[in-house]
Amino acid sequence: MVQCLVVDDDPRILNYIASHLQTEHIDAYTQPSGEAALKLLEKQRVDIAVVDIMMDGMDGFQLCNTLKNDYDIPVIMLTARDALSDKERAFISGTDDYVTKPFEVKELIFRIRAVLRRYNINSNSEMTIGNLTLNQSYLELQVSNKTMTLPNKEFQLLFMLAARPKQIFTREQIIEKIWGYDYEGDERTVDVHIKRLRQRLKKLNATLTIETVRGQGYKVENHV
């Protein structure tokens, strides 16, 4: 089941969103502040966060930046601030979507599901290739009795490659699929993620490897 973190200093909004999420079979974890949300994340995995901007202490912009950079969690801003400058700052902070108050909770749920689809978190599927099992629900890799949890983007990148063995993916294709077509960062971030994945696969003694195809991109090979 999808785990959704909702952060807002208004308890009425927290209860309102949580009750509707639960009817849609989405687990809701409500927190009144950015600091409380980060404390929760020390012990609880979530798939997506809905974040207010105007909060005491850590505001929504700061929280969004931390969620994206430290936890790699997709974020939807939910706020009464509708100025273009606020939206610009939110997207610079890393938000995946922006919803203004007052809002229709059904629309918020539509947007949550749309962002989850973009991140491929809407499925509980497992995939096994060689001696490696990938659990998409928990972002876990397993080889024999060894289990490893990955950051979201690393897992989705590996899952995409493993789902199409021997197909070559260019950096541009990977960025569009994993980071989104509007990503403005350095495409070399793909190389960094690939390097980390190779290290993790080696540590697990997986038979799956990620190969570089010179001048083209990356593909996976299973050595059994």
Swiss-Prot record:
Q: Which organism is it from?
A: Staphylococcus aureus (strain NCTC 8325 / PS 47)
- Tell me which residues form the DNA-binding region: 124-222
Instruction: Write out the annotated subcellular location.
Output: Cytoplasm
Which keywords does this Swiss-Prot/TrEMBL entry list? Activator, Cytoplasm, DNA-binding, Phosphoprotein, Transcription, Transcription regulation, Two-component regulatory system, Virulence
- What InterPro entries is this protein classified in? CheY-like_superfamily (IPR011006), OmpR/PhoB-type_DNA-bd (IPR001867), Sig_transdc_resp-reg_receiver (IPR001789), WalR-like (IPR039420), WH-like_DNA-bd_sf (IPR036388)
Domain Response regulatory as annotated: residue spans: 3-116
PTM annotation: Phosphorylated by HssS.
Gene from which the chain derives: hssR
Which GO terms label this protein's molecular function in UniProt? phosphorelay response regulator activity; transcription cis-regulatory region binding
Query: Which CDD domains does UniProt cross-reference here?
Result: REC_OmpR, trans_reg_C
One GO biological-process annotation of the entry reads: regulation of DNA-templated transcription
What GO CC annotations are associated with the protein?
cytosol; protein-DNA complex
What is the name of this protein? Heme response regulator HssR
